[in-house]
Each structure stands twice: as structure tokens, then as C-alpha cells.
């Protein structure tokens, strides 16, 4: 009889564990459904709030004119949004996702989900022999190894020039005799405020790299012309590498042209 009671008790315990797992699975499904609904609501608000047939504003025909940048175009006032509120929707190790309520130019309200990022630096490291330093690393978001120029995120308040020197040493083991600013790009301004400051490093000397504990990197030195060819035929997809390679190539051609004229 005691053995039968033990068996029954074991069955009851297993049944209880099964029920608990079922409850947990149901809760996860409910959480996923809620999160999906939130995302759908966010996307709906982000794209449009209302019937497109009722739209009373149109872009109009393109205008041939000189390039106008910054806040110098008076027409910009007709497309600007006014932030009404901003709350942190999610906090991560590297960036946050904030949810903004905004007023559209026509007075309607919409929701914008924005990734708040501290920014980053990227370095076009050019050797005296005309080779570019590239790092090969696995990018989890893409699920594959990518080929990029060295780069890294800024810490809040960090000087980008100092960060560029630090990242170059950490990822490649190189120090630079000169680091010059090239440009700043917005990595994906449709939903993220990250700015990447791109520098060119020359006068390189090799030391010892010290990547972060979770960074596994291989470093290559390739001909600048070969990198530019890979950019132009679409084999390089990384935005900062595309911009950095083309800028470096343009500068090199201009310098060579100036030297030939002299």
C-alpha cells in the first residue's frame, strides 16, 4: 500500500509540475501577444493615424534648386513635428528605447519609438603602403561575420577623438601618429539617434590589441582600391565602412591630383 501511495504521490507531483509549466507557457504566450499588440499599435501610430483618403497635404512636384541644409529652408516648418512627451519604454545595456508622443504639422498626434544611443566612432586606418585596416567579427543582429572598419561606442561625455584612438588600439593593436576627423553620419535616423563620427588614422604603428571580453576579432590589411571595388559592387554593406572607404578614396585621389599639378 505504501508503495502505491508513493507512486500516486509521484504522479501527482509530475502532474503539478506539468500544470505549472503549462501556466508558465500560457503566461509567456499572453506576454508575447500583449507585446505584439503594443508593437502593432506603435507601428500603426508611427505610420499614419487616420484614413489616407482624408489627407489634405501632399509633397508636390520636386523643385530644382541649390542644396539647402540645416534650418535654412523656411519650408521645413511645414513638416516639423512637436514633441509632447517622452517615456522610457525599454532600458538595455547599450541603448534605450523611448516612446514619444508628438504633434504632427496638421495637428494630429502620433507615437514615435526612438532608440536613444550614446553614439560611436569609426576609424579609417590607412598604412603608408596604402592599405586599409579591416576587422572581421560576428554580428549577432545579422547572424553572420561582417567586414568593417574599426569602430566602437562612446561612453557618455567621452571626446570622440579620444574614443577613436582608444578603439583603434583596442581592436587592432595600432596607434596613430595622426587622427583627422572626416565626417559624422546618422546610422539609421528613421528610428535611432546614433551618430557615428568617422576619423582617418595615419602614421600607424603596431602594438598589442586589447578587445573587450566578449569581442572576437580578426584583423586584415587590404588595398584601398580593393575595398572601394567591394563597396561599389555591393559586397560591403556596413554603412560606416562604405562612407569611410569612399571618403578615404576621394581624399587620396585629390591629394594625388594636387601633387601631380605641383
Give the positions of each predicted feature.
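Conserved Nudix-box catalytic region and its N-terminal flanking loop in Nudix hydrolases
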Residues: 4, 46-56, 62-69, 73, ...
Amino acid at each position: 500500500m505504501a508503495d502505491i501511495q508513493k507512486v500516486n504521490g509521484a504522479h501527482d507531483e509530475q502532474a503539478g509540475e506539468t500544470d505549472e509549466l503549462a501556466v508558465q507557457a500560457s503566461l509567456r504566450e499572453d506576454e508575447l501577444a500583449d507585446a505584439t499588440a503594443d508593437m502593432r499599435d506603435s507601428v500603426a501610430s508611427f505610420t499614419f493615424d487616420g484614413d489616407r483618403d482624408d489627407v489634405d497635404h501632399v509633397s508636390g512636384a520636386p523643385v530644382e534648386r541649390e542644396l539647402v541644409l540645416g534650418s535654412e529652408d523656411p519650408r521645413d516648418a511645414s513638416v516639423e513635428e512637436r514633441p509632447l512627451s517622452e517615456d522610457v519604454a525599454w532600458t538595455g545595456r547599450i541603448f534605450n528605447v523611448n516612446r514619444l508622443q508628438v504633434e504632427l504639422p496638421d495637428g494630429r498626434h502620433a507615437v514615435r519609438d526612438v532608440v536613444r544611443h550614446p553614439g560611436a566612432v569609426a576609424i579609417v586606418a590607412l598604412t603608408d603602403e596604402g592599405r586599409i585596416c579591416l576587422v572581421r567579427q560576428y554580428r549577432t543582429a545579422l547572424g553572420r561575420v561582417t567586414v568593417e572598419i574599426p569602430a566602437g561606442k562612446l561612453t557618455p561625455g567621452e571626446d570622440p577623438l579620444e574614443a577613436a584612438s582608444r578603439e583603434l588600439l583596442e581592436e587592432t593593436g595600432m596607434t596613430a601618429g595622426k587622427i583627422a576627423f572626416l565626417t559624422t553620419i546618422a546610422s539609421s535616423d528613421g528610428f535611432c539617434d546614433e551618430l557615428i563620427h568617422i576619423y582617418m588614422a595615419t602614421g600607424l604603428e603596431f602594438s598589442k590589441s586589447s578587445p573587450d571580453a566578449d569581442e572576437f576579432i580578426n584583423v586584415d590589411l587590404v588595398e584601398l582600391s580593393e575595398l572601394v571595388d567591394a563597396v561599389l559592387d555591393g559586397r560591403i554593406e556596413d554603412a560606416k565602412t562604405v562612407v569611410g572607404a569612399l571618403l578615404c578614396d576621394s581624399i587620396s585621389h585629390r591629394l594625388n591630383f594636387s601633387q601631380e599639378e605641383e
